[in-house]
Amino acid sequence: MKRRDFIKTAGGLAVAGSLGGISTVAQGCSSVPRFNMNKLGTGAGLKLSFAPYELQLRHTFTVSSYSRKTTPGVQVRIDYEGFTGYGEASMPPYLGQSVETVTAFLQKVDLSQFNDPFQMETILAYVDSLSPGDGAAKAAIDIALHDLVGKLLGVPWWRLWGLDAAKAPSTTFTIGIDTPDVVREKTRECADRFNILKVKVGLDNDKEMIRTIREVTDLPLAVDANQGWKDREEALDEIFWLKENGVVMVEQPMAKENIDD
């Protein structure tokens, strides 16, 4: 069974017995509106809209190659029969994507030709065919479409996929490169709310960053050098030292072009 067939079948079972255009299903103490599957393909097409925004960061965020006080994003929404799915495009600078490239791609997308959001493979294949790249914009549409379908069914995706929410991977809190005082402050703010912390490294104060954090917490750490270590020898020296200090994962140790090392 293909993914869209599974989703549509699951949706039909989920709303069987519903009365009128929208029914509700109790989930805990709340009622979640659900879509009448009999209306699929009979109404207007999907409506795509988007809005760029800029988040103001509480602390200046520094990595090995740049610093910033804000971070841009583009919110994507897909509307269908009174339901709305949301997605977000995140644009890492090193991937060459920006608010401008994301919005330029989204302006090409016409989802009004589709009046059944459960045709996910067809819809996403169309979106992918519009350009060879633009991963951030495509991901935002993908997320919004999944969010919409989950809301139409009144069922979260972790449940549709048969996952255990209690066993979901931990989310990290990222601590940017900064002075010891600010690093201590950031660590105190998050240490009791996360099971693992992610630390930006890749400059000449890597050990100072880790030692400062260790003054506050003994939580497991992941580090991201953002391609800041120059060669294999430097990277290995750093990695061995980091392992001795409770670091369990290293991300982007060297330049992305340096594949052989």
Locate predicted features.
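N-terminal export signals
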Residues: 5-27
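C-terminal segment of N-terminal export signals and the immediately downstream linker at the start
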Residues: 22-59
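N-terminal secretory signal peptides
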Residues: 1-2
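Metal- or metallocofactor-binding catalytic centers and their adjacent structured scaffolds
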Residues: 39-50, 66, 78-79, 84-152
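A short, compositionally biased
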Residues: 69-74
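Short, P/G- and charge-enriched loop/turn segments at secondary-structure junctions
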Residues: 60-65
